[in-house]
Design a protein with these regions (language model features):
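Low-complexity or membrane-interfacial segments used for flexible interactions
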Residues: 4-10, 15, 19-88, 94-97, ...
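Tandem-repeat architecture and repeat-register "anchor" residues
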Residues: 78-79, 101-105
């Protein structure tokens, strides 16, 4: 009797999970190195000038991330200090030259992160990006707009003339948090890479905080 009562609930749960997966698939614009550009990217924006791929180390105290090209060569690497209140992160190129630095502002409710591009500009990102159902965010210092699904990092980046700079897509069902960056303006490569790595670290911190909160809640029950 109990099994018969629970069967419809089980079916509804399966339908719900499949629905979420299908919805996430419609937002995903990821493609692996060597694969053709996502057909939606191609139809909407044409062939990108180049594609880059980020991959987070599975077990790393320094939150290491490699950024590789279409031939799987590492072109950038990011690493965070192990003991740092500001979560200081450095991005270096293949010649170990610093490309950008990222720091979190202390005592900020919005978890503001400052990004400095070497030889370029400085700007900030905040956790306001991850508001529920908020699909658009402007980086005031750059005049750029991010539009899409920030909670899973599937978004399009536009400049102040509404031209596409890059399209970022997350790989579904990956333990290493892999992302594809289709670049349409290679002159902004370092800035785009810094934005994606900052958002990756912010998203991971958000997930860890949610897990910690959930664990604490369960322990108190």
């Amino acid at each position: 009797m109990y099994i018969e009562m629970m069967y419809p609930v089980f079916i509804m749960m399966v339908i719900f999970i499949v629905g979420i997966f299908v919805f996430a698939t419609t937002l995903q614009r990821y493609h692996s190195a060597g694969e053709k550009t996502d057909i939606r990217n191609y139809n909407d924006y044409g062939e990108p000038a180049k594609s880059l791929y980020t991959s987070r180390y599975l077990f790393s105290f320094h939150k290491d991330i490699d950024v590789t090209d279409e031939n799987d060569n590492v072109v950038y690497h990011s690493s965070s200090k192990l003991f740092s209140f500001t979560n200081e992160t450095t991005i270096t190129d293949v010649q170990d030259r610093v490309v950008a630095t990222i720091e979190r502002k202390l005592f900020s409710l919005h978890l503001i992160h400052y990004i400095d591009i070497v030889g370029g500009t400085s700007f900030e990102l905040s956790k306001d990006l991850f508001r529920f159902l908020d699909m658009k965010f402007t980086i005031d210092e750059l005049g750029w707009t991010l539009q899409g699904d920030f909670t899973n990092l599937n978004f399009v980046l536009y400049n102040n003339q509404e031209r596409v700079i890059a399209v970022v897509g997350q790989k579904l069902l990956s333990m290493r948090d892999k992302y594809c960056i289709d670049l349409y303006d290679v002159n902004e490569e370092a800035t785009v890479v810094a934005i994606v790595i900052t958002l990756e670290n912010m998203l991971m911190a958000r997930r860890n905080a949610n897990r910690s909160s959930s664990h604490t809640h369960n322990s108190n029950m």
